[in-house]
């Protein structure tokens, strides 16, 4: 007997059974099941994959080029600054080397002239007008027996070590500001004259004395008579 010949009640029962089976199967299906989604996922085409790889390579190449350009510009700037500084140093070095001897020569009094300034031994019984009770350079009192150097013309006295150090960098008296240039020039001029006189050899005059020729015999009066 075929299914078309089944009674209506049997067909209705069959339809109900199939409907309940389908609904139960749908209820058991998880919409968030990854395994089921994998079945329905569509595999990407090879053309899309190739385009994505090409874009990534282009971006990487551009980033490398930009980094290289930035590094080259920075290195060029550093080399340029270093070259400018070296050129300025080379230009200023000969000027400073030429100017330093003049400044150093005019900086203070020469030791040769300084040694010619008189030195006295201090005592409280001294009545020199230029010597006080203390050294104005180190601000310490004079003690009996200390060696003091007196400056010419103003006659101010100071400790030898103090005034020697002062006059290595100054040309004036630390107390009255009297200039010592003329005095030092005079002293150095006398020294240069003395040195020139000592260095020039004395001219020796050689006098040659020839022996006298023998004269003839002279007859005296007695012999003639």
From Swiss-Prot:
Catalytic activity: S-ubiquitinyl-[E2 ubiquitin-conjugating enzyme]-L-cysteine + [acceptor protein]-L-lysine = [E2 ubiquitin-conjugating enzyme]-L-cysteine + N(6)-ubiquitinyl-[acceptor protein]-L-lysine
Main location: membrane
Zinc finger (RING-type): 135-177
GO biological process: protein ubiquitination
SMART domains found in the cross-reference section: RING (SM00184)
GO cellular component terms attached to this protein's record: membrane
Family: Belongs to the RING-type zinc finger family. ATL subfamily.
Domain notes: The RING-type zinc finger domain mediates binding to an E2 ubiquitin-conjugating enzyme.
Protein name: E3 ubiquitin-protein ligase ATL76
UniProt lineage: Eukaryota, Viridiplantae, Streptophyta, Embryophyta, Tracheophyta
């Amino acid at each position: 007997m075929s299914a078309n010949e089944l009674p209506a009640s049997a067909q209705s029962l069959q339809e109900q059974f199939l409907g309940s089976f389908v609904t139960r199967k749908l209820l058991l299906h998880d919409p968030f099941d990854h395994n089921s989604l994998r079945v329905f996922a569509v595999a990407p085409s090879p053309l899309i994959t190739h385009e994505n790889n090409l874009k990534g390579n282009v971006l990487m190449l551009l980033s490398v080029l930009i980094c290289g350009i930035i590094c080259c510009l920075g290195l060029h700037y550093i080399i340029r600054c270093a070259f400018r500084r070296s050129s300025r140093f080379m230009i200023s070095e000969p000027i400073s080397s030429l100017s330093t001897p003049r400044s150093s020569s005019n900086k203070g009094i020469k030791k040769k002239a300084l040694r010619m300034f008189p030195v006295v031994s201090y005592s409280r019984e001294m009545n020199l007008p230029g010597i006080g009770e203390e050294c104005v350079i180190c601000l310490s009192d004079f003690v009996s027996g200390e060696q003091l150097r007196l400056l010419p013309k103003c006659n101010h006295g100071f400790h030898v070590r103090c005034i020697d150090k002062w006059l290595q960098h100054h040309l004036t008296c630390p107390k009255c500001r009297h200039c010592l240039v003329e005095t030092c020039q005079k002293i150095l001029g006398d020294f240069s004259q003395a040195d020139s006189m000592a260095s020039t050899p004395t001219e020796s005059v050689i006098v040659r004395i020839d022996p006298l020729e023998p004269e003839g015999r002279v007859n005296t009066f007695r012999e003639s008579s």
